[in-house]
Amino acid sequence: MEAREVEEMRRSRLLTLGGIGYTAVIALAALVLVMGALGLVLKVAAAAGALPSEVAKVANALPGLKASVDANPAAGSLSSVSVST
């Protein structure tokens, strides 16, 4: 092989790896945004008076997600909402 062909192959591999890395970063950023939005929705639902067990049940029905809500419905307070994959 000529040096030029080797250089073209090397450049092609780097572009492919860069594209894969770029796609992975975008996918991770999208996942973070979705998780944040889901957490916000759960907080609003819990603050609106939904029972914590109902909110967690709906969130846990989504594939790949686990949610927990710590709240005191009698006092109308919301301690925390957490969502994880």
Swiss-Prot record:
Q: Say where the protein is mainly found.
A: membrane
Kindly indicate where the leader peptide sits in this chain: 1-18
User: Where is this gene product found?
Assistant: Cell outer membrane
Transmembrane region(s)? 22-42
Gene Ontology cellular-component terms for this entry are: membrane
Keyword list, A-Z: Cell outer membrane, Membrane, Signal, Transmembrane, Transmembrane helix
Membrane topology per record: Single-pass membrane protein
Q: What does this protein do?
A: The most abundant protein of the outer membrane, it forms a pore through it.
Something else the entry says is: Ignicoccus hospitalis is unique in having an energized outer membrane while ATP synthesis occurs within the periplasmic space.
Q: How does it assemble?
A: Forms extremely stable complexes with apparent masses of 150, 50, 45 and 38 kDa. Found in a ring-shaped complex of 7 nm diameter with a 2 nm channel through the middle. Complete denaturation requires temperatures over 110 degrees Celsius.
Q: What name does UniProt use for this protein?
A: Major outer membrane protein 1
Q: What is the protein's species of origin?
A: Ignicoccus hospitalis (strain KIN4/I / DSM 18386 / JCM 14125)
- Gene name of the encoded protein: ihomp1
